[in-house]
Swiss-Prot record:
The gene is HAS2. Phosphorylation at Thr-328 is essential for hyaluronan synthase activity. O-GlcNAcylation at Ser-221 increases the stability of HAS2 and plasma membrane localization. This is Hyaluronan synthase 2. Keywords: Cell membrane, Endoplasmic reticulum, Glycoprotein, Glycosyltransferase, Golgi apparatus, Isopeptide bond, Lysosome, Membrane, Phosphoprotein, Transferase, Transmembrane, Transmembrane helix, Ubl conjugation. It catalyses: [hyaluronan](n) + UDP-N-acetyl-alpha-D-glucosamine = N-acetyl-beta-D-glucosaminyl-(1->4)-[hyaluronan](n) + UDP + H(+); N-acetyl-beta-D-glucosaminyl-(1->4)-[hyaluronan](n) + UDP-alpha-D-glucuronate = [hyaluronan](n+1) + UDP + H(+). The chain crosses the membrane at residues 12-32, 46-66, 375-395, 403-423, 430-450, 476-496, 511-531. SUPFAM superfamilies: Nucleotide-diphospho-sugar transferases (SSF53448). Residues 1-11, 67-374, 424-429, 497-510 are cytoplasmic. Belongs to the NodC/HAS family. Pathway: Glycan biosynthesis; hyaluronan biosynthesis.
Amino acid sequence: MHCERFLCILRIIGTTLFGVSLLLGITAAYIVGYQFIQTDNYYFSFGLYGAFLASHLIIQSLFAFLEHRKMKKSLETPIKLNKTVALCIAAYQEDPDYLRKCLQSVKRLTYPGIKVVMVIDGNSEDDLYMMDIFSEVMGRDKSATYIWKNNYHVKGPGETDESHKESSQHVTQLVLSNKSICTMQKWGGKREVMYTAFRALGRSVDYVQVCDSDTMLDPASSVEMVKVLEEDPMVGGVGGDVQILNKYDSWISFLSSVRYWMAFNIERACQSYFGCVQCISGPLGMYRNSLLHEFVEDWYNQEFMGSQCSFGDDRHLTNRVLSLGYATKYTARSKCLTETPIEYLRWLNQQTRWSKSYFREWLYNAMWFHKHHLWMTYEAVITGFFPFFLIATVIQLFYRGKIWNTLLFLLTVQLVGLIKSSFASCLRGNIVMVFMSLYSVLYMSSLLPAKMFAIATINKAGWGTSGRKTIVVNFIGLIPVSVWFTILLGGVIFTIYKESKKPFSESKQTVLIVGTLLYACYWVMLLTLYVVLINKCGRRKKGQQYDMVLDV
């Protein structure tokens, strides 16, 4: 016992020293600015910090590639499908078409005997349509429904402790005695809905799969995740490949679709190689039920800075698994399609909310670095502090008073994006990933200031994405973007003022003209390809009915 405690202390000290040393090393490399390659007049340079970031991308891609090879090798792994599985669907003001597609995909799941529990966040007449769709798709004679006036934590009007306990027991009994059940309950947020499903199921099943009501599941999605959990008893949770259902509806949803592929098949695949996936996504994930019930109460009652947390449910659920020392994995063999915002403002609000949960959970996650591979510490430091270095770099370049610095920054952003997207195109075998380089502009212009705003308002939970039936427009997300553009505009004005004081040399004029032409040609080429792709694929997808997720 004492030996284990001593080893634990050593691991805590070791991972802490590693993380601090890594951060100090990166900071020193950035401040010193040592250059390996440098041309006259600083038209081009490649330094120590740039080399470190390039190495990170290469190493991350390598381990992602190795993890995908492991996934392919497990293709023929035979397993016994004798474990019990329950699918929990969280629903809130869902678009009727998306909900119907979700439930139709649930009916096509190939895992035998899977139990379906859908909990609707809201019990008013306006929410009844979701229960009607559930009964229609799942079969009125094969499913049960229940309208609960309260939930596990809030009593209904005029309800006593005893009647509340009886209604809670009734919900539990309905869930345990029916293969398919839909219950409506008093509004309480997604975490309340998930808690109801987990609590009602109790320990009656081996594995619990989670799903959102805007998600279309591939028929084999449950089977593939069960395979991962069955192969290693120390894997506590597994997530699948989440793709975009409405990717051709707007430029935002299209760029999100290529970003999703990178996030899951490069970043999370790399994390999976080391058994430390940071977030098992809500649309497609599965957990060992025995673990869930070790922390479900703590998960529900999570507080941050004195307030109960109302977002980041999936990320904290993953963190709770990691806190017990269990691994979390990703499998590209389990797939689903999900809806993503098609309006810029709704996307921006969604990203801000996700950034809040990321930074909050980063702090929680840091307490368990010592229980996992050093890669978990390494990646947390890199991804957690990268936005701050990037902001410092952008401001520095824009306020140096040299127009070439601004142009070089724009060219570098696109070049790095093009290199990453080219590798992704090779790995995926689809040229569409080249558009990932366009996402870098969206990241620099919108997501970067949104991250800073998320930190500044990390304890505010009053806004985010709304239900899909009624879209609520929230303009607060434009505040950080407006501030960011004002800062950049100030740099541009300062640069024009400085450069106007002295004429350009002939060599400088040539470099600026060539750089501008390259940048313009790049945009013309990619935008032309985008228009062609949308015209070709977007029309084909409209009105198409999908029997399988993989058809999309």
